[in-house]
Amino acid sequence: MIELTAASSNLPSYLAAYDTNFSYNGNGWFSRSFSTGQDQWSAGVDTEGVDNNIPSVIMGIDDYSYSPGLFNGDVTSLTLGRNLEYDAGQDLWVQDEELIINNVSGYMPDTTTFAYAIYSLSHGGAVDGLGTFPGLTDYFAEQGTMQVGNLGLDDTLLGFGGQDTFVFQDGSAFDTVNSFDLAVDILDVSAWGATGLGDLSISTIGADTVISSSDFTDGITITGVTGLTAANFEFA
């Protein structure tokens, strides 16, 4: 599951800026909290107490070890953010969390693609991969995603080429989905109370599809795609 925050509300722009502004280049480091036993892998530039606004990444792990392109252990979460620093009180590395990635049914699959995506991330924030190495977006395509946006922030979500499910909350406002795959992607509008297509207003504007809730307080624009059917929705 990919959870957006206000900082990552426009997901395509966020990922592009993360790649551009990530200045750390190395293998990252492991740490274990003596107070909680929590294992972490972190990569980024330590603020040393003064915010630097530089992107960073923290992985929550159980019994984890890593060498470039190879690791063992169980990944509980991967969080992109900025302003990385060590919190002595918690004996943990922390950051301003901006994009939270986890698996709602357990650990994140630690495939070969994931291992190389982590390498690409820590070497310059290359979310789309580094040279011949896959990136985080390749992992999203491999595994599929469930993307959960914000309340009231007019998010822009992004399909990655696998089976993506876009979850819209009651009060999600007017969101946009780019790179929607008509063959496999799903729009979850169950929180709107919609039980079928009859509970939605669906129109075509140029090459886009515009979907509105029954009370027109929430909406979705699917860019560059028309011809959606009930198979593209998850209803209440």
Language-model segments: residues:
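Glycine-centered tight beta-turn/hairpin loop motif at sheet-sheet or coil-to-beta transitions
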Residues: 50-56, 172, 214-217
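Short, hydrophobic/aromatic-rich segments at coil-to-beta transitions
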Residues: 35-46, 73-76, 144-148, 161-166, ...
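Low-complexity acidic/polar repeat-biased segments
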Residues: 70-138, 203-236
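Acidic, glycine-rich calcium-binding repeat modules characteristic of RTX/beta-roll
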Residues: 1-30, 148-198, 217-218
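Predominantly extracellular/secreted and cell-surface proteins with exposed
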Residues: 28-73, 81
